[in-house]
Amino acid sequence: MKPFAILTLLATAAALASCQSQPRELRPMSSAPQATGVEGSWVDPNGIVSTFAGGTFSTRTTDTNQLLASGNYVNVSPTLVEINMTSLVRNTQSKVNCALATPAQLNCTTDSGAQFSLARRG
């Protein structure tokens, strides 16, 4: 390439670079939205998966995806949920109250007083 052509390209590049009138605004990248409420999938220490979706609750095994329990839930407050469910294993109905301890942990108590925790599934 001829020296004159190189000089012309460099001058053109410099002229174009100087056309910007203001520095570009750099916006911080937002991270993935934090999950709110109980919507989504949760897992217990035994690997059983519970799903909350639009007022419907279900619990399934992870290996065969067998339905163990199903029912409905109501958000009593932003951090409290009440589940009315039927156990398909025991053929019993029960009420469970759960408190959202953290966005990733749900602490629950059955109507018989048994307590358990669920962890949000990533």
From Swiss-Prot:
Residue positions of covalent lipid attachment, annotated as N-palmitoyl cysteine: 19
Highest rank taxon of the organism: Bacteria
Swiss-Prot/TrEMBL keywords: Cell outer membrane, Lipoprotein, Membrane, Palmitate, Signal
Topology term for the membrane: Lipid-anchor
Gene Ontology cellular-component annotations: cell outer membrane
Signal sequence region: 1-18
Subcellular location, record wording: Cell outer membrane
Lipid-substituted positions (S-diacylglycerol cysteine): 19
Family: Belongs to the rhizobiaceae omp10 lipoprotein family.
Name by which UniProt lists this protein: Outer membrane lipoprotein omp10 homolog
Species: Rhizobium meliloti (strain 1021)
Annotated gene: omp10
